[in-house]
Amino acid sequence: MPITLGSGEHRYRVVENWAKLPDGWTLTDVASVAVDSKDRVYVFNRGAHPMIVFDRAGNFIKSWGEGLFGRAHGLHIDAHDNLYCTDDGDHTVRKCAVDGKVLLTIGIPNKPAPFMSGEPFHRCTHTALSPKGEIYVSDGYGNARVHKYTPDGKLLKSWGEPGSDPGQFNIVHNISTDADGWVYVADRENHRVQVFDGNGEYEAQWNNLHRPCALHCCGGQSPNFIIGELGPGLAVNRGAPNLGPRLTIVDSKGKRVARLGGENGPGLEAGKFLAPHGVALDSKGDIYVGEVGVTNWKTSFGDTPMPAEVGRARCLQKLEKIQ
Protein backbone atom coordinates (compact mmCIF):
# COMPACT_ATOMS: atom_id res chain seq x y z
CA MET A 1 0.00 0.00 0.00
CA PRO A 2 1.56 3.35 -1.02
CA ILE A 3 2.41 5.78 1.75
CA THR A 4 0.53 9.10 1.68
CA LEU A 5 1.45 12.42 3.25
CA GLY A 6 -0.49 15.61 3.92
CA SER A 7 -4.17 16.34 4.41
CA GLY A 8 -7.21 17.87 2.70
CA GLU A 9 -6.40 19.30 -0.72
CA HIS A 10 -2.71 18.70 -0.11
CA ARG A 11 -2.34 14.92 -0.12
CA TYR A 12 0.55 13.18 -1.84
CA ARG A 13 1.49 9.60 -2.62
CA VAL A 14 5.16 8.66 -2.13
CA VAL A 15 6.59 7.22 -5.37
CA GLU A 16 9.36 4.88 -4.28
CA ASN A 17 12.42 4.22 -6.44
CA TRP A 18 11.32 6.86 -8.92
CA ALA A 19 14.68 7.76 -10.50
CA LYS A 20 16.01 5.15 -12.95
CA LEU A 21 19.73 5.79 -13.14
CA PRO A 22 22.15 4.14 -15.58
CA ASP A 23 24.01 1.19 -14.05
CA GLY A 24 26.72 2.27 -11.65
CA TRP A 25 25.61 5.90 -11.44
CA THR A 26 24.96 7.65 -8.14
CA LEU A 27 23.38 10.96 -7.20
CA THR A 28 25.05 11.43 -3.81
CA ASP A 29 23.49 14.65 -2.43
CA VAL A 30 20.73 16.25 -4.51
CA ALA A 31 21.16 19.94 -3.84
CA SER A 32 18.30 21.25 -5.99
CA VAL A 33 15.66 20.30 -8.55
CA ALA A 34 13.85 22.15 -11.36
CA VAL A 35 11.15 21.22 -13.89
CA ASP A 36 10.95 22.68 -17.41
CA SER A 37 7.97 23.45 -19.66
CA LYS A 38 7.94 19.85 -20.94
CA ASP A 39 7.95 18.40 -17.42
CA ARG A 40 11.53 17.23 -17.69
CA VAL A 41 13.12 17.09 -14.25
CA TYR A 42 16.61 18.56 -13.79
CA VAL A 43 18.49 17.14 -10.82
CA PHE A 44 21.45 19.25 -9.67
CA ASN A 45 23.55 16.88 -7.61
CA ARG A 46 27.00 16.36 -6.11
CA GLY A 47 27.82 13.12 -7.87
CA ALA A 48 30.03 12.59 -10.92
CA HIS A 49 27.25 13.79 -13.26
CA PRO A 50 26.12 17.12 -11.76
CA MET A 51 23.04 17.66 -13.91
CA ILE A 52 20.90 14.62 -14.61
CA VAL A 53 17.65 14.95 -16.55
CA PHE A 54 14.65 12.61 -16.18
CA ASP A 55 11.16 12.49 -17.64
CA ARG A 56 8.09 12.52 -15.35
CA ALA A 57 8.20 8.74 -15.07
CA GLY A 58 11.77 8.83 -13.80
CA ASN A 59 13.38 7.59 -17.01
CA PHE A 60 16.92 8.85 -17.60
CA ILE A 61 17.24 11.28 -20.53
CA LYS A 62 20.75 12.73 -20.35
CA SER A 63 23.38 14.34 -18.16
CA TRP A 64 25.69 17.33 -18.45
CA GLY A 65 27.93 19.57 -16.38
CA GLU A 66 30.72 17.08 -15.82
CA GLY A 67 33.86 19.04 -14.92
CA LEU A 68 31.99 22.36 -14.84
CA PHE A 69 30.68 22.71 -11.30
CA GLY A 70 32.54 22.83 -8.00
CA ARG A 71 29.63 22.05 -5.66
CA ALA A 72 26.01 22.01 -6.74
CA HIS A 73 23.75 24.09 -4.52
CA GLY A 74 20.81 25.98 -6.08
CA LEU A 75 18.80 25.59 -9.30
CA HIS A 76 16.15 27.87 -10.78
CA ILE A 77 14.48 27.66 -14.20
CA ASP A 78 12.90 30.58 -16.05
CA ALA A 79 9.92 30.79 -18.41
CA HIS A 80 12.21 30.14 -21.38
CA ASP A 81 13.70 27.00 -19.83
CA ASN A 82 17.02 28.61 -19.01
CA LEU A 83 18.62 27.14 -15.90
CA TYR A 84 20.34 29.25 -13.24
CA CYS A 85 22.86 27.01 -11.51
CA THR A 86 24.25 28.31 -8.23
CA ASP A 87 27.59 26.81 -7.25
CA ASP A 88 28.65 27.53 -3.69
CA GLY A 89 31.90 25.64 -4.27
CA ASP A 90 33.30 28.07 -6.85
CA HIS A 91 31.16 31.09 -5.86
CA THR A 92 29.31 31.57 -9.15
CA VAL A 93 25.90 31.59 -10.78
CA ARG A 94 25.80 30.13 -14.30
CA LYS A 95 22.87 30.60 -16.64
CA CYS A 96 22.71 27.51 -18.85
CA ALA A 97 20.61 26.29 -21.75
CA VAL A 98 18.86 22.93 -21.37
CA ASP A 99 21.74 21.27 -23.24
CA GLY A 100 24.26 22.63 -20.73
CA LYS A 101 25.66 25.47 -22.81
CA VAL A 102 26.75 28.29 -20.49
CA LEU A 103 25.02 31.54 -21.51
CA LEU A 104 26.11 33.79 -18.64
CA THR A 105 28.39 33.57 -15.61
CA ILE A 106 28.04 35.90 -12.62
CA GLY A 107 30.97 35.84 -10.24
CA ILE A 108 34.58 34.83 -10.79
CA PRO A 109 35.14 31.07 -10.44
CA ASN A 110 37.14 30.19 -7.33
CA LYS A 111 37.58 33.88 -6.38
CA PRO A 112 35.32 34.43 -3.35
CA ALA A 113 34.70 37.84 -1.85
CA PRO A 114 36.10 38.29 1.67
CA PHE A 115 34.09 36.55 4.38
CA MET A 116 31.05 38.60 5.48
CA SER A 117 32.21 41.56 3.39
CA GLY A 118 28.82 41.99 1.73
CA GLU A 119 30.48 41.87 -1.68
CA PRO A 120 29.37 39.16 -4.13
CA PHE A 121 29.92 36.22 -3.72
CA HIS A 122 31.06 34.11 -0.80
CA ARG A 123 29.36 30.73 -1.13
CA CYS A 124 26.20 31.91 -2.88
CA THR A 125 23.24 29.59 -2.49
CA HIS A 126 20.32 30.20 -4.89
CA THR A 127 18.70 32.48 -7.48
CA ALA A 128 15.27 33.83 -8.39
CA LEU A 129 14.00 36.16 -11.11
CA SER A 130 11.81 39.24 -10.95
CA PRO A 131 8.88 39.58 -13.39
CA LYS A 132 11.23 41.77 -15.48
CA GLY A 133 13.95 39.12 -15.56
CA GLU A 134 16.21 40.73 -12.95
CA ILE A 135 18.28 38.16 -11.09
CA TYR A 136 18.30 37.87 -7.29
CA VAL A 137 21.07 35.85 -5.67
CA SER A 138 21.11 34.68 -2.05
CA ASP A 139 24.63 34.86 -0.63
CA GLY A 140 24.76 32.68 1.49
CA TYR A 141 27.18 30.81 3.74
CA GLY A 142 30.05 33.31 3.80
CA ASN A 143 27.87 36.41 3.45
CA ALA A 144 24.52 37.62 4.81
CA ARG A 145 23.33 39.33 1.67
CA VAL A 146 20.90 39.40 -1.25
CA HIS A 147 22.19 40.80 -4.55
CA LYS A 148 20.05 42.09 -7.42
CA TYR A 149 21.36 42.00 -11.01
CA THR A 150 20.15 43.07 -14.42
CA PRO A 151 19.20 40.21 -16.75
CA ASP A 152 22.67 40.43 -18.32
CA GLY A 153 24.47 40.22 -14.98
CA LYS A 154 25.22 43.81 -13.92
CA LEU A 155 24.93 44.44 -10.19
CA LEU A 156 22.09 46.83 -9.28
CA LYS A 157 22.03 46.69 -5.50
CA SER A 158 22.57 44.51 -2.44
CA TRP A 159 20.96 44.34 0.98
CA GLY A 160 21.28 42.49 4.28
CA GLU A 161 23.82 41.99 7.04
CA PRO A 162 24.50 39.40 9.74
CA GLY A 163 22.01 39.37 12.61
CA SER A 164 18.50 38.42 13.64
CA ASP A 165 16.58 41.68 13.22
CA PRO A 166 14.29 42.34 10.23
CA GLY A 167 16.43 42.60 7.11
CA GLN A 168 19.31 40.74 8.74
CA PHE A 169 20.27 37.15 7.97
CA ASN A 170 21.85 34.08 9.48
CA ILE A 171 22.58 31.84 6.47
CA VAL A 172 20.67 33.19 3.47
CA HIS A 173 19.87 29.77 2.09
CA ASN A 174 17.22 30.12 -0.59
CA ILE A 175 15.27 32.77 -2.46
CA SER A 176 12.05 32.92 -4.47
CA THR A 177 9.80 35.52 -6.11
CA ASP A 178 6.15 35.75 -7.09
CA ALA A 179 4.30 37.26 -10.04
CA ASP A 180 3.93 40.59 -8.22
CA GLY A 181 7.66 40.93 -7.65
CA TRP A 182 7.81 40.19 -3.92
CA VAL A 183 11.05 38.54 -2.83
CA TYR A 184 11.00 35.68 -0.31
CA VAL A 185 14.21 34.71 1.48
CA ALA A 186 14.81 31.54 3.50
CA ASP A 187 16.76 32.84 6.50
CA ARG A 188 17.71 29.38 7.65
CA GLU A 189 19.36 29.69 11.03
CA ASN A 190 16.96 32.45 12.08
CA HIS A 191 14.18 29.91 11.46
CA ARG A 192 12.10 32.19 9.26
CA VAL A 193 11.28 33.36 5.75
CA GLN A 194 11.59 37.11 5.24
CA VAL A 195 9.55 39.00 2.63
CA PHE A 196 10.86 42.08 0.79
CA ASP A 197 9.76 44.26 -2.08
CA GLY A 198 11.83 44.17 -5.26
CA ASN A 199 14.22 46.81 -3.93
CA GLY A 200 14.96 45.09 -0.65
CA GLU A 201 12.54 46.94 1.63
CA TYR A 202 11.43 44.66 4.46
CA GLU A 203 7.74 43.76 4.47
CA ALA A 204 7.09 40.77 6.73
CA GLN A 205 8.42 37.52 8.11
CA TRP A 206 7.01 34.01 8.40
CA ASN A 207 7.85 32.17 11.60
CA ASN A 208 6.99 28.79 13.14
CA LEU A 209 9.50 27.12 10.84
CA HIS A 210 12.54 24.99 11.62
CA ARG A 211 15.68 25.72 9.61
CA PRO A 212 13.91 26.53 6.30
CA CYS A 213 16.18 25.31 3.57
CA ALA A 214 14.19 24.81 0.36
CA LEU A 215 11.68 27.39 -0.89
CA HIS A 216 9.43 27.11 -3.94
CA CYS A 217 6.69 29.46 -5.15
CA CYS A 218 3.84 27.46 -6.68
CA GLY A 219 2.94 30.27 -9.12
CA GLY A 220 -0.16 32.25 -9.99
CA GLN A 221 -1.87 34.99 -8.01
CA SER A 222 -1.76 34.65 -4.21
CA PRO A 223 0.44 31.56 -4.55
CA ASN A 224 1.19 28.86 -2.07
CA PHE A 225 4.80 28.11 -1.18
CA ILE A 226 6.51 24.82 -0.39
CA ILE A 227 9.19 25.05 2.28
CA GLY A 228 11.68 22.28 2.96
CA GLU A 229 12.81 22.28 6.58
CA LEU A 230 15.89 20.60 8.00
CA GLY A 231 15.79 18.67 11.25
CA PRO A 232 17.82 19.53 14.35
CA GLY A 233 21.41 20.56 13.73
CA LEU A 234 22.70 19.74 17.21
CA ALA A 235 23.42 16.39 18.83
CA VAL A 236 21.65 17.47 22.02
CA ASN A 237 18.20 17.53 20.36
CA ARG A 238 18.81 14.94 17.67
CA GLY A 239 15.69 12.82 17.31
CA ALA A 240 13.36 15.30 19.00
CA PRO A 241 9.82 14.99 17.58
CA ASN A 242 8.01 17.65 15.54
CA LEU A 243 11.16 19.42 14.34
CA GLY A 244 11.48 17.83 10.91
CA PRO A 245 12.93 17.17 8.48
CA ARG A 246 9.69 17.91 6.62
CA LEU A 247 7.87 19.91 3.97
CA THR A 248 5.49 22.69 4.95
CA ILE A 249 3.01 24.30 2.55
CA VAL A 250 1.96 27.87 3.36
CA ASP A 251 -0.29 30.40 1.67
CA SER A 252 0.84 33.76 0.28
CA LYS A 253 0.77 35.30 3.77
CA GLY A 254 2.80 32.51 5.34
CA LYS A 255 -0.12 30.72 7.03
CA ARG A 256 0.41 26.97 7.14
CA VAL A 257 -2.08 24.96 5.10
CA ALA A 258 -0.38 21.54 5.21
CA ARG A 259 2.61 19.74 6.64
CA LEU A 260 4.23 16.67 5.14
CA GLY A 261 6.26 14.38 7.39
CA GLY A 262 8.69 15.25 10.14
CA GLU A 263 6.74 14.15 13.20
CA ASN A 264 9.27 11.53 14.26
CA GLY A 265 12.56 12.77 12.88
CA PRO A 266 14.55 11.66 9.83
CA GLY A 267 14.52 8.22 8.28
CA LEU A 268 15.00 6.12 5.17
CA GLU A 269 11.48 4.71 5.20
CA ALA A 270 8.90 5.82 2.65
CA GLY A 271 7.21 8.98 3.88
CA LYS A 272 10.24 10.20 5.80
CA PHE A 273 12.87 12.74 4.83
CA LEU A 274 16.60 13.02 5.41
CA ALA A 275 17.39 16.67 4.68
CA PRO A 276 15.13 18.52 2.18
CA HIS A 277 17.36 21.00 0.35
CA GLY A 278 15.58 21.70 -2.96
CA VAL A 279 11.95 21.47 -4.09
CA ALA A 280 10.23 21.70 -7.49
CA LEU A 281 6.72 21.24 -8.84
CA ASP A 282 5.58 19.87 -12.22
CA SER A 283 2.48 20.74 -14.27
CA LYS A 284 0.42 18.03 -12.53
CA GLY A 285 1.23 19.34 -9.07
CA ASP A 286 3.67 16.55 -8.22
CA ILE A 287 6.53 17.52 -5.90
CA TYR A 288 10.18 16.60 -6.42
CA VAL A 289 12.41 16.80 -3.35
CA GLY A 290 16.19 16.94 -3.43
CA GLU A 291 17.90 16.03 -0.17
CA VAL A 292 21.45 16.35 1.17
CA GLY A 293 21.29 13.15 3.15
CA VAL A 294 24.96 12.30 2.67
CA THR A 295 26.29 15.63 3.92
CA ASN A 296 23.72 15.70 6.72
CA TRP A 297 24.00 12.05 7.77
CA LYS A 298 26.26 12.51 10.79
CA THR A 299 24.22 15.51 11.97
CA SER A 300 21.04 13.42 11.92
CA PHE A 301 22.29 9.96 12.84
CA GLY A 302 25.58 10.43 14.68
CA ASP A 303 27.89 7.42 14.40
CA THR A 304 25.28 5.14 12.80
CA PRO A 305 26.82 3.79 9.56
CA MET A 306 25.29 5.32 6.43
CA PRO A 307 23.66 2.73 4.12
CA ALA A 308 24.93 2.74 0.54
CA GLU A 309 21.43 3.50 -0.77
CA VAL A 310 21.65 7.03 0.66
CA GLY A 311 24.43 7.88 -1.77
CA ARG A 312 22.84 6.13 -4.74
CA ALA A 313 19.41 7.63 -5.27
CA ARG A 314 17.66 8.00 -1.88
CA CYS A 315 18.33 11.75 -1.87
CA LEU A 316 15.71 12.30 -4.59
CA GLN A 317 12.02 11.75 -3.90
CA LYS A 318 8.82 12.21 -5.88
CA LEU A 319 5.50 12.91 -4.19
CA GLU A 320 2.55 12.42 -6.54
CA LYS A 321 -0.40 14.70 -5.90
CA ILE A 322 -3.62 12.83 -5.16
CA GLN A 323 -6.30 14.48 -7.30
PLM features: what roles do these ranges have?
Residues 1-323:
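Eukaryotic scaffold repeat domains enriched in small/polar residues
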